[in-house]
């Protein structure tokens, strides 16, 4: 079988104990990332609702573990199955806090957002330039 050489625009970003790989200019990835925030908010609301009814620490820890898994599944949906967020984040629960009290989930999204925004802007800029070039060539050929 022959191998096709194809540049998919995938870039690598050091994250935790591994490498996160994705194409920051992929509009599909950007859309999924933008859809992630409301889903994360819903997971947080669900976590708060469910934890009110729990009476012991073991149940709360189990709920946190399940919610962490759901959010990591969403990250896999956004960035692809080749990016194992449990491994990348050294099995740290995304709802754990850093020294300033921010959740690991918030830190992760804040770190990724400017990379993806720049990628989306680059994609739009290239599309605009290509459209302008097409229009220029059409005008010249008339």
Give residue spans per PLM region.
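Short N-terminal mixed-charge amphipathic segments
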Residues: 1-61
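Short linear sequence motifs
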Residues: 6, 15, 26, 70-72, ...
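Noncatalytic linker/hinge segments flanking ATPase motor cores
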Residues: 53, 61-64, 114-119
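Short coil/turn segments at secondary-structure boundaries
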Residues: 58-66, 96
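Charged, long alpha-helical segments
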Residues: 63-83
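C-terminal charged interaction modules
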Residues: 77, 82-142
């Amino acid at each position: 079988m022959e191998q096709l050489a194809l540049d998919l625009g995938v870039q690598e970003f050091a994250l935790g104990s591994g490498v996160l790989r994705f194409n920051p200019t992929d509009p599909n990835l950007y859309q999924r990332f933008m859809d992630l925030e409301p889903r994360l908010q819903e997971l947080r609301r669900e976590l708060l609702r469910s934890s009110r009814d729990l009476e012991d620490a073991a149940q709360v820890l189990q709920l946190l573990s399940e919610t962490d898994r759901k959010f990591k599944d969403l990250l896999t949906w956004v960035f692809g199955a080749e990016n194992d967020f449990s491994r990348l984040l050294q099995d740290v629960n995304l709802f754990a806090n850093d020294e300033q009290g921010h959740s690991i989930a918030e830190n992760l999204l804040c770190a990724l957002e400017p990379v993806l925004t720049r990628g989306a802007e680059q994609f739009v800029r290239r599309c605009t330039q290509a459209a302008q070039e097409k229009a220029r060539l059409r005008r010249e050929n008339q």
